[in-house]
Amino acid sequence: MRKILSTIFGLILLTAWVQAEPLSPADVKSLLARIRDMRVKSPHVQADFREEKTIRLMNKPIVSAGKVWFHPPNKFRREVRGNSPSVTVSDGQQLWIYYANFKSAEHYSLGKRSPVDAAIAAVNTALNLENVENTFQISGRKIDNGYELELLPRSPSMKRIFQRFNIRINSELLVERTEMVQPNGDRLVTTYSNQTRAPIPASTFEFTPPPGTEITTPLGR
């Protein structure tokens, strides 16, 4: 389950709060409205990413990099490059995680109120900022080149997934950096670059396992 959460949080995308100007509740509400309007006009987002995962029981963080494609509310593709390549794809109805080195894939059916559904819903709510005020306590600050938002979960179910979620947004209202802290102290920081809102082909969110792939269904369905 931790592997799935880390993969999802890696999408989906923190500077010091020094010299930042706090936003009033009205300012936060206005900013959220602007972000939603922008995503209605240009829903597609793709970017390169670098992820640094700090786990309590490990001395060094785990670093990975690759590219991500996202179409709200729940379609995404995430390709990790390097020595341990992987591909994670969701079309909103099913989720695939493919490990090229092992020629194996995990398959999850979505929409069945599983832990995976809960995790995806939590992150999508945070990143899409749809009705986010009902799920999180939100504070924000204006920085030189954009904004920073801190999201604290309200419900017990959300608190089991993460303790807090910080988002840095640039002046073009694109996510530049996210930081997620889990209840056990694990920390995931993802930075994004080369963002674009260019249209993404529907086939990007489709996945067919290569011949010979060993397929497992960890949740049994």
Predicted segments, located by residue:
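Gly/Pro-enriched, hydrophobic low-complexity segments
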Residues: 106, 131-220
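An acidic-aromatic
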Residues: 67-119, 188
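Short beta-strands and strand-coil junctions in structured, solvent-facing domains, enriched
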Residues: 56-57, 77, 84-86, 97, ...
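Extracytoplasmic segments of membrane-associated envelope/inner-membrane machinery
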Residues: 98-100, 105-141, 148-150
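Positively charged n-region of N-terminal signal peptides that target proteins for export
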Residues: 1-4
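N-terminal leader/targeting segments and the immediate start of mature chains
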Residues: 16-61, 209-221
